[in-house]
Regions:
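Right-hand nucleic-acid polymerase module
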Residues: 1-86, 94-215
Length: 215
């Protein structure tokens, strides 16, 4: 007798993304925001997003970025619970020590364009809990829609890459040309605060789950 199976494709897609992004190689989890997510158009947002990531690629990999070498990342666009607040979640493999990559990435986004949010409003930290962070980043994939903006800005290198070979004086100079020591110092304070808040949120969710389990 033939059995009928009802497959929840939305959940399957979301689960698969979470599985991929829970890989320990994705050392950074981030959210990039705009000053007015409700006002910015998709075309403008996409252009800013792509240009930003290309600039990051050029900063860390120099001319190799023009040959297809870049920061490996998956990006997901989201509009918020009310559907009127465009922003982007991402998971990335940091090409340098993740903590300092977070500082640099946040500073560069905050001053990239007049419509990109100040660094205190973005959220870029080293990945703290792989399963939780991947689930949060891909939560809108459950809607089973085609994310053209996120896909276009995402990047995977064609071949395995040893990023340490790019950690040299030339890379350091490119970073210094884009981000000042003062900006890094201020960014560290923000990253430290966001790491602490992320840990607190994880703890609070765990406590709530424990309470529900005892009821």
């Amino acid at each position: 007798m033939q059995q009928n199976y009802k497959i929840n494709w939305q959940q399957c897609v979301s689960d698969k993304w979470q599985e991929v992004l829970a890989d320990e190689a994705y050392t950074v989890t981030g959210t990039l925001k705009f000053n007015k997510g409700a006002a910015i158009g998709r075309t403008t947002a996409s252009k800013i997003l792509n240009a930003y990531w290309h600039k990051l690629d050029r900063t860390f990999f120099g001319h190799a970025a023009n040959k297809g070498i870049g920061i490996e990342r998956w990006i997901f666009s989201e509009y918020g619970s009310a559907g009127d607040n465009l922003h982007f979640h991402f998971k990335a493999k940091a090409p340098i020590e993740p903590y300092y990559f977070c500082c640099i990435a946040n500073v560069m986004w905050s001053k990239f364009h007049r419509q990109t949010a100040r660094n205190i409003y973005n959220w870029i930290t080293p990945t703290i809990l792989k399963a939780n962070s991947s689930g949060y980043s891909v939560k809108d994939t459950r809607h089973f829609t085609y994310d053209a903006m996120g896909l276009e800005a995402s990047h995977q290198n064609k071949h395995a890459l040893d990023t340490t070979t790019f950690q040299n004086a030339a890379q350091a100079q490119r970073i210094i040309n884009k981000v000042s020591i003062e900006e890094i110092t201020k960014a560290r304070q923000i990253v430290d605060l966001q790491i602490e808040e992320t840990i607190q949120r994880i703890y609070q969710r765990q406590r709530k789950a424990e309470v529900r389990g005892t009821q």
